[in-house]
Amino acid sequence: MRRRLLAVLAALIATSAALVATLVVTPGPAAASPAGQFTNPLVNQRADSQIVKHTDGYYYFTATVPEYDRIVLRRATTLQGLSTAAETVIWRKHSSGVMGAHIWAPEIHFIDGKWYVYFAAGATDNVWAIRMYVLEGTGANPLTATWTEKGRITTAWDTFALDASTFVAGGVRYLIWAQSEPGIATNSNVYIARMSNPWTITGTPVRIATPTLDWEKRGYAVNEGPTVIQRNGRIFLTYSASATDANYCLGLLTASASANLLSASSWVKSPQPVFTSNASTGQYGPGHNSFTTSEDGQSDILVYHDRSYRDISGDPLNDPNRRTRVQKLYWNADGTPNFGIPVPDGVTPVRLQSYNSAGSFVRHYNFRARIEANVTPLADAQFRIVTGLNGGGTVSLESTNFPGYFLRHRNFEVWVERNDGSATFKADASFFRRAGLSTGTGSDAAVSFESQNFPGRYVRHSGADLFVQTATDATSRADATFTLD
């Protein structure tokens, strides 16, 4: 196969009926769900990342390592804990022959009481003879399980194939993967087939995605790394497109959960990518994703890799600095996923939902702060709660899509403006985080923000616009209370 920059896999989903909640994310969170904050990057120099939440209370993590020579696992009871969790090598490449080079995109699943790892590998005498393979693990903890090689997944053609993932829908287990098909002038397409067991497909594979759009063919004509999240009666299949540099991005296929998934016409491709590089936030080439859920099970979490710089010296395949990142996945009112933008490094952002105007969120519009429902783009309503610019135990709220811009009051109106470094700005943009005035619970789910330099005045909405005003009655206290989402 041509030297298409690093082949990648996406991850997750797929599980036995006993573990549907583990690997297939099903309906659960409402339009707003409790915020969970993480610090990115989660794991440096780990690409094609997959995180699985298992029923034993642990998150399991696997990814491609820069040396392309082994399969590793980590586990922790929290997502953030994976950052520092010990890493265990469960398998190493062969010293000769097949499975001897380019060990890429491992993905772990628990099926019918056993662990399975899907991965791609080349051969020592032909590193580009990439094919899909399966390991089977016996034991409660996959880091200490006994692993055996189940061999290669045989498909319709003996061609470049990678990024195997599996999921269950309607009681049927499917395999999805990327492959180069003879007679089609693309680097890889996405396919689906039924499975007769965790390492064997049955029937005729069906091609469901081909790189035909401009954004899918930048550098290379690639559709790869498929993975699934099931929600709201639909199956959403994300895939990665183009070369694995700053052009790399996520596309989306959608099918009804009741449709014939082995019919290509059941899958509808979104005309635009759903997740792309963002120069403002300093994130490039986001892709090869998976999905997991928050510790409380109420929020869906997007897992992916990217780089912190656009320009790469030489072949991106030789650049080791793709890193694992996580951020909350949101859902639109129509039941479709909203990926937003790859958020800046550091603490992840939240949305501030009005306590007394459900479904309305703080956003900036022409840099004026206000509350509004169905905010587009999503990032206009996302803010990072960071250490207060003026110190003293305060916090500041930084715009996600305009890093360096903060909520601040000016003439008691709340605006989103660039930090000019002045003492006045720092004071105007610093707030004490209080328990929600309307609830008094002190929980993270209900908060109010009191001005540091005008004690007794709180961020509140009056109508749609935000002001810094006193909150002396029930209405104003409710106006000054927000839930974190």
Feature locations, PLM:
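Extracellular glycan-recognition/adhesion modules and their associated mucin-like linkers
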Residues: 344-368, 384-413, 432-464, 481-485
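N-terminal export and membrane-targeting signals
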Residues: 1-13
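Short polar catalytic/cofactor-binding loops
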Residues: 47-48, 56-57, 65-67, 356-360, ...
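C-terminal region of N-terminal signal peptides and the immediate post-cleavage residues
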Residues: 6-8, 18-35
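Short amphipathic alpha-helical linker/capping segments at the junctions of internal repeats
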Residues: 21, 376-382, 422-433, 473-485
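Carbohydrate-active catalytic/glycan-binding domains of CAZyme proteins
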Residues: 33-350, 380-387, 428-437, 444-446, ...
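Residue-level signal for alpha-helical transmembrane segments in multi-pass membrane proteins
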Residues: 13-26, 63, 119
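Extended intrinsically disordered, low-complexity coil regions enriched in Ser, Thr, Gly, Ala
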Residues: 364-377, 411-413, 418-423, 463-465, ...
